[in-house]
């Protein structure tokens, strides 16, 4: 039987999602709980391996086991013992492959354009400057669509750097919400895109540099990788 877990977490307390030796990770905590409950080694497969400080409103992982599971009881058991910064929202029987069956992922990046807020420092990028909507709209139009994003990742071993992404935004008070949708993203890709936006707004780069950056296929053409604290894995859609 395969069981699909829907969870959320506060990423500021973990060294990312993926298991790392002697580090507190989301995956490590989930597998520790499952292995304790079933008294056997349980491995999980997740849709996204979020980086350190990155949060998730909706992450998915699955595990396979050869017994029938009381899913409501399992949810209660995990939530009663797991780290306080992780919450299991739902468990269901499913044949979904959380990596191969993904058709869209949505991430949100939050930027504070107002006064510095120490209470939100782990949850919103404290840029604390107004971002010109003219710059923002032009930037989004240049970055959205299908491109080779080799310059926007530190991953040197990927076989395909082409991604088709859609970016939108909205503003609520002082907070700018950048919304990214794509079937998949490269490592640090969103944070590097946001970093470029901030550098353009600061005058360190220009809109006209974007084409050159794409063409260079070199991470060194960028100056800044935005903090992980403002990034949220928001939604994942699967083919049915």
What are these regions, as identified by a protein language model?
Residues 1-240:
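Structured-RNA-binding interfaces characteristic of tRNA pseudouridine synthases
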């Amino acid at each position: 039987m395969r069981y699909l877990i829907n969870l959320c977490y506060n990423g500021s307390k973990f060294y990312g999602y993926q298991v790392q030796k002697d580090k507190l990770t989301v995956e490590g905590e989930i597998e520790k709980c499952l292995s304790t409950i079933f008294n056997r080694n349980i491995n999980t497969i997740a849709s996204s391996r979020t980086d350190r400080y990155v949060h998730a409103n909706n992450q998915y992982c699955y595990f396979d086991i050869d017994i029938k599971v009381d899913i409501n009881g399992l949810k209660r058991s995990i939530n009663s013992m797991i780290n306080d910064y992780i919450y299991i929202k739902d468990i269901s029987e499913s044949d979904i492959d959380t990596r191969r069956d993904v058709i869209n992922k949505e991430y949100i990046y939050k930027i504070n354009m107002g006064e510095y807020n120490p209470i939100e420092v782990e949850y919103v990028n404290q840029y604390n400057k107004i971002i010109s909507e003219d710059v923002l709209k032009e930037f989004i139009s240049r970055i959205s669509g299908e491109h080779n994003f080799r310059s926007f990742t530190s991953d040197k071993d990927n076989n395909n750097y082409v991604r088709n992404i859609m970016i939108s935004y909205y503003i609520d008070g002082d907070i700018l919400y950048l919304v990214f949708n794509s079937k998949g993203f490269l490592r640090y890709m969103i944070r590097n895109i946001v970093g470029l936006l901030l550098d353009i707004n600061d005058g360190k780069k220009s809109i006209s540099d974007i084409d050159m950056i794409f063409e260079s296929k070199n991470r060194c053409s960028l100056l800044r990788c935005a903090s992980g604290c403002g990034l949220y894995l928001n939604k994942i859609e699967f083919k049915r």
